[in-house]
From Swiss-Prot:
Function: Binds the lower part of the 30S subunit head. Binds mRNA in the 70S ribosome, positioning it for translation.
Name of the featured protein: Small ribosomal subunit protein uS3
NCBIfam families (UniProt xref): rpsC_bact
GO molecular function terms listed in the Swiss-Prot or TrEMBL record: mRNA binding; rRNA binding; structural constituent of ribosome
Any single biological process term in GO: translation
Sequence ranges assigned to domain KH type-2 in this UniProt record: 38-106
Bias kind Low complexity: ranges: 285-303, 311-333
Assembly with partners or alone: Part of the 30S ribosomal subunit. Forms a tight complex with proteins S10 and S14.
A Pfam entry, by short name: Ribosomal_S3_C
One GO cellular component term noted in the UniProt record for this chain: cytosolic small ribosomal subunit
Gene that specifies this protein: rpsC
Keyword tags: Ribonucleoprotein, Ribosomal protein, RNA-binding, rRNA-binding
Family matches, as PANTHER family: 30S/40S RIBOSOMAL PROTEIN S3, SMALL RIBOSOMAL SUBUNIT PROTEIN US3C
Length: 341
């Protein structure tokens, strides 16, 4: 199928674009006829200008015509006289305001339409078709084309029987949709009849359509990931003052080392006493435990009730008395002496 179909229409929307860009409902037929008439006017009146293609874009009250040519000076004319004439003819044909843009083809040696037109002009001047084809091949390959195929058909050399001959150099993958293949056709008028010239030029593969969209989406995702990483790097720096203010509330180094060494989770009880009267936080396992007999406990309670809050230094004496109480029979007398004193 790729050998027979027009390469431009076969790859439309993949590597090639529409030559006419407009939308119409009822006027569709009239617009198509106008486009054909515009292109016919450009090709017939200016064969020497080397026009490659004509792009047409329509709006409600304006028509934009882009002319791609290898010789813009011929299209513009002296002081723009030729361009003004073309614009006037187009406005008369379309009955609308016409915006005319003349664009230069940077590399005409690899433009298929211009190459076909050049070969046809040489055939019209009775140049050998083989020489014209080989010259076109060499110039296109030197200009950077990866593959070229030139085909001529008709009464070649004035023969009574028409035939088709072609020359090819490099790769011309007509079945590959991603291949950027330019196609051109032109007819040479000779004394023996018309000779058709077709040119295929392979310029390389083009990433388009879904592949291009997937690459664009991947780039957006990568940008978002980079932004997220930068935000994460800036977040600890913003929270560092809060960590510094909470640092004084951490337990003492000796107290914090014991639970970590034991390997168990020890609940921490926060001290609600005012500052200066106790530790801020202390593990439950390290809280002082007072073990005393009922009598000693009553004595301590009595002293605490009479002494008030200043009786806190008496805890070491009470704990010492509690440790000596189970030792012998003199424990009650010691407790009595302590109470009398």
């Amino acid at each position: 199928m790729g050998q027979k179909v027009n390469p431009h229409g076969f790859r439309l929307g993949i590597t090639t674009e529409f030559s006419s860009r407009w939308y119409a409902d009822r006027m569709y037929r009239d617009y198509v006829k106008e486009d054909v008439a515009i292109r016919r006017m450009m090709t017939r009146g200016m064969e020497r200008a080397g026009i490659s293609r004509v792009e047409i874009e329509r709006t409600r009250d304006r028509v934009r015509v882009d002319i791609h040519t290898a010789r813009p000076g011929i299209v513009i004319g002296r002081r723009g006289a030729e361009a003004d004439r073309i614009r006037a003819d187009l406005e008369k044909l379309t009955n609308k305001q016409v915006q005319l843009n003349i664009l230069e083809v940077k590399n005409p040696e690899i433009d298929a339409q211009l190459v076909a037109q050049g070969v046809a002009e040489q055939l019209s001047q009775r140049v050998s078709f083989r020489r014209a084809m080989r010259k076109a091949l060499q110039s296109a390959l030197k200009a950077g084309a990866k593959g070229v195929r030139v085909q001529v058909a008709g009464r070649l050399g004035g023969a009574e029987m028409s035939r088709t001959e072609f020359y090819r150099e490099g790769r011309v993958p007509l079945h590959t949709l991603r291949a950027d293949i330019d196609y051109g056709f032109y007819e040479a008028r000779t004394t023996f009849g018309r000779i058709g010239v077709k040119v295929w030029i392979y310029k390389g593969d083009v990433v388009a359509g879904r592949d291009h969209e997937a690459a664009r989406v991947a780039a957006r995702v990568q940008q978002r990931a980079v932004r997220g990483r930068s935000a994460r790097r800036e977040q600890p720096a913003a929270e560092s003052p809060a960590l510094e203010t909470a640092a004084p509330a951490v337990a003492e180094p000796g107290a914090a080392a014991a639970p970590a060494a034991a390997g168990a989770d020890v609940p921490v009880v926060a001290d609600t006493a005012p500052a200066g009267q106790g530790a801020a936080e202390r593990p439950v396992a390290e809280q002082p435990v007072v073990t005393a007999e009922p009598a000693a406990a009553a004595a301590v309670t009595g002293e605490t009730g009479t002494g008030g809050s200043n009786a806190a230094p008496a805890e070491p004496t009470t704990s010492a008395a509690a440790e000596e109480a189970p030792g012998g029979a003199d424990a009650p007398s010691d407790a009595t002496e302590t109470k009398e004193g």
